[in-house]
Amino acid sequence: MYTIAALYHFTRFADPAALRPALLDLCLAREVKGTLLLAQEGINGTIAGPRAGIDAVLAHIRALPGCADLEWKEATSDHPPFARMKVRLKKEIVTMGQPDVDPKARVGHYVEPEEWNDLIRSPDVAVIDTRNDYEVAIGTFEGAVDPQTESFRDFPAWWEANKDRFHNKRIAMFCTGGIRCEKSTNFLLGQGVEEVYHLKGGILRYLEETPAENSTWQGECFVFDNRVSVGHGLKEGPYDLCHGCRRPILEEDKARPEYEAGVSCHHCIDETSDEDKARFRERQKQIALAQTRGERHLAAE
């Protein structure tokens, strides 16, 4: 059984590059895989591995400057969620492209999962999903506004174009684990919105703690690992990935004429060139060859 830990923490790292070697070495030594992002604004990522390995890595992160109060969300999987370990240096741990946004200065009001339903059902509250369009497509909260953004970078422009729709409304925001809302609520406060709320722990904590019969969640929650999606109780869902575009697809989507394993699906068949598709086919061929040798090709991640 693999333990999965999703984490983020905003703090000040004077020299993120200096933190990378020891963190990567520890993960490799303890057979922990996944992706961790380091930037001057903090750390973000999801890792998976044996219980003892995850505990060792979390203890190491909590010992980093300003990370003693690190919080994370856990789940389990009976198959490895990641094929390799990456510790990457970034300008931002979640990219919004707004240099004046600083979640360490102020954020919206945190709302516990058990209080969320009452808030979003209030007539003076507008609920905004801050995730990307392909995530929203497989699940969201009842009544939520979908900005239809392809990237979190698009959110500020969407708000500027649509803010008049939310005049005199309290704003409630949510995302997968909470990190995007740290920035989006700070952004809205900076834009003069007076009452901004966000779901503490994100969708994942809500699904973990809220019984399905009391839930306002509809569908599945997209996750950035080999589980692809989870539902209530963080139970692994029915979705797979199209490895041509990385969008979630169902088993019945694989029966459609646009689907070719590792190459295309109905979402992306018209988005890639013949040259791209030829490259994807070669990649898929190498993955299949690795499988016949009992190996896992890194491109299969």
Model-derived regions: residue spans:
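Rhodanese-like catalytic fold shared by cysteine-dependent sulfurtransferases
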Residues: M1-V107, R131-I171, I179-E301
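Structural scaffold elements adjacent to functional motifs in cytosolic proteins
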Residues: V127-D129
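Short, well-ordered loop/turn elements at secondary-structure boundaries
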Residues: R121-D124, H167-N168
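Internal catalytic-core helix/loop-beta-alpha segment
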Residues: R106-S122
